[in-house]
Amino acid sequence: MASILLSIKPEYVERILSGSKKYEFRKRLASKPVEKIFIYSTAPTMQVVGEVQVVGTISASPTALWEQTKGSAGITRDKYRKYFKGCKVAHAYRL
């Protein structure tokens, strides 16, 4: 299993580290199975601030993925839909 470094906006970093955001959404997954994500908080923080264990991944249509994850998504539906606009498949790392 691999470890990866992901750039994440500070508002989402806080939610991940507090445990209220249990999914990290991505348009693509890493090519190898991921065991750990090192979190790089983007501007204004601009540094690695922590790490989280990955317990699995989910891939589905954006609508189906939202229905599965919305309770602990840590993101508004509007921002989620904007991020995945035009995508046929959406992915999430389960944290």
Regions found by a protein language model. Give the residues of each.
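Structured alpha/beta reader/binder surfaces that contact nucleic acids or chromatin modification marks
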Residues: M1-R94
